[in-house]
């Protein structure tokens, strides 16, 4: 039996981020809808061609999205929230953009749909909204149109469709509460119609994505799979597709389904292939996701060959990417500045397609020449294991020497708080900000000129110093109590630290989509992490010299740096996090020596690092909390440690939040009208809290009365003596006029509350 290969999806944005540029040009009114549609057509044609040329047997169609593939599925099903609908009930690309971003060149602006993380990745999807009794119909034929496009170009294709149960699982009920699973029978006819249309076009296989099957689903959701797929069978062959984790715990549900094939993620999952092979119906096709779609490392193809060869001829087999290549940069050949040795360790999306082709050829026709080719390809990644760029004996020794004392502050919070009160003598309702101030065109230009060599170090430092001086003066004038230096020198909260730590490398074009038109360029962790010299001390010390008020030192925490980077695969995530923590621990010590008495360690990614299955949470939370404490615990008792987190859900990890033992935690609460504080109240959270009093993502300026009302609401849940007053996030993306006005109102609200206590 000949083995075929396929990818589960390909990056959409284009090598030069063409899609992003076309979207933003269209949104700004600088180009027409037809020009935007043409860019999409060109990108799809290029990406299909590139995959085919790299040796992919079946190219995916339906993985392209104008904003997000879950949103595309909503439109396919005719699921458009009332506030975003066209008057005539039609659906067009502006409907899609209004759901995604709240506005489009046509139609009335309305609140965008909620956005959240796609499983445990750094990609975000638009959350489908469901109402009782809503109707579904085939409303947006993008998938069928793109299938026609690809067939006209002569490609062998495999359409991709998000499965009905995962789609419902990912959504939220709006308005009157009901069980959204009850909508299953209403959406299945649309799926049947789509599959019938694909069958008419001669499609043999459809990839139907059900990643919810890697989760610990409630029994009623598992029970829904059988009747759902009974309704969908018969028109085309269905490849039930899972990714991001193992499926062993749901294997009984899966193997009873009337489908013709199953895709499993062999990279992130830990399913025993021999057992899996034995447990599946013998006539099923088994697709093995062996090339990691979520990271940038070259595959050890020789190892995969040895592991897979026993399965050849046991059943129909395909080889695939572990998940969509959406999470990978596009082409390593564009990286002209990477060190040659380091570059030899990487593979981006196009290289991953070539890896699939090479491995497939070797398994289909194994001979000495093919095995030698696999060995030659795998040699760099094997040589990496002993590279001096990877291993640092001092870091490894220091990691091994960590004791329980290293992760505990000297005194408990109550005793520390007393010494901190004496040191800082802050008023009731102390005011502060989260860290960053507006990144003006001037600031960005200064950094770019320095990076590209148009500005020397001395003039760059002079320029940054002026911006810090301005930020301190603004805060003094506003009357804030604890100041920040404003982070003018920082491009990104992770990239900035990665650039100053050994063990990281950066790409020129390693862009991946985060959501909509937003792309990120994550650093790559290639080896043991250490800090060659102080990172933030110079600027913090300078800022503190300008004022009598305390200035916070600002660090990004170890778990966030890990989660927002491409990590190593040869050591555990725990090891990486603790190496970063040790490096930043030295930074805490140096900040203290420089006279900085308040140090903030941001961990916005602590919750998103959680494993998909709750059974694995405790182990993760244990080392994540330990990494934070290892970073912070070197601080003296009178040094106040702050942390900042922005999530919508604390209840289920409250124990771990408390275990961080930060003296002050600032959180994002403004959009939830302080409801998030219920978690802290119910838990009787012992330390100090700064609930965000206004939403920095909006240009709207909150009134003094509105902020005051929120603070009163907070004081009903948390004792006033433990409350801080702050925005809910950094102010980097805002302009100075609304920043000044909002902070002035915030300070005035705090002053009014203080006066009541006198």
Swiss-Prot record:
5-methyltetrahydropteroyltri-L-glutamate binds at residues 17-20, 117, 518-519, 564, 608. Signal peptide: none annotated. The gene is metE. Its cofactor is Zn(2+). Binds 1 zinc ion per subunit. Pathway: Amino-acid biosynthesis; L-methionine biosynthesis via de novo pathway; L-methionine from L-homocysteine (MetE route): step 1/1. This is 5-methyltetrahydropteroyltriglutamate--homocysteine methyltransferase. Belongs to the vitamin-B12 independent methionine synthase family. It comes from Yersinia pestis (strain Pestoides F). GO terms for molecular function: 5-methyltetrahydropteroyltriglutamate-homocysteine S-methyltransferase activity; zinc ion binding. CDD domains: CIMS_C_terminal_like, CIMS_N_terminal_like. It is an enzyme of class 2 (transferase). Its EC number is 2.1.1.14.
